[in-house]
């Protein structure tokens, strides 16, 4: 391939490795993930790729891909905007139990994703 993974992809991979480790612990039935501050979007990205390994996710949307102005930014992910940015990636987490710790309103696309999955909509912390 000749190309390195973006740093944010490496971070999401590290989180996925931690999720797999937690799932393999003796007597481990539930895995909850919290991504706070700058790591919120990393956790959302990992959760979208976790294929049902998580029980719940608490995260914030501290930034969005559309805010990144430089391809050298550590959180730049090629193609992220084609996926719908953070909203599209977050929608891929449905039907995971999700609580967002920021006060931004829920995008209608998120509500639609959880509704289509037959799950309770994400919660937004007051």
Predicted segment positions?
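Cap/lid segment of the alpha/beta-hydrolase catalytic domain
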Residues: 1-23, 63-74
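Hydrophobic alpha-helical scaffolding
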Residues: 5-8, 12, 46-47, 76-83, ...
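Extracytoplasmic/secreted proteins, especially bacterial periplasmic and envelope-associated proteins
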Residues: 14-17, 42, 88
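Short glycine-enriched nucleophile-adjacent loop
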Residues: 20-24, 40-51
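Alpha/beta-hydrolase fold nucleophile elbow
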Residues: 22-37
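Core-facing hydrophobic residues within beta-strands of well-ordered domains
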Residues: 28, 53-54
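The feature captures the conserved acid-bearing segment of alpha/beta-hydrolase catalytic domains
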Residues: 55-116
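Short acidic-hydrophobic, aromatic-tinged amphipathic segments that line or gate anion-handling sites
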Residues: 123-126
């Amino acid at each position: 391939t000749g190309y390195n993974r973006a740093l944010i992809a490496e971070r999401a991979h590290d989180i996925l490795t931690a999720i797999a480790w937690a799932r393999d612990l003796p007597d481990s039935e539930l895995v909850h993930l919290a991504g706070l501050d700058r790591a919120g979007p990393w956790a959302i990205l990992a959760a979208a790729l976790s294929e049902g390994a998580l029980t719940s996710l608490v995260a914030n949307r501290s930034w969005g891909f559309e805010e990144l102005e430089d391809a050298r930014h550590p959180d730049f992910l090629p193609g992220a905007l084609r996926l719908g940015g953070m909203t599209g990636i977050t929608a891929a987490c449905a039907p995971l139990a999700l609580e967002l710790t920021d006060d931004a309103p829920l995008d209608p696309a998120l509500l639609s994703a959880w509704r289509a999955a037959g799950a309770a909509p994400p919660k937004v912390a007051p």
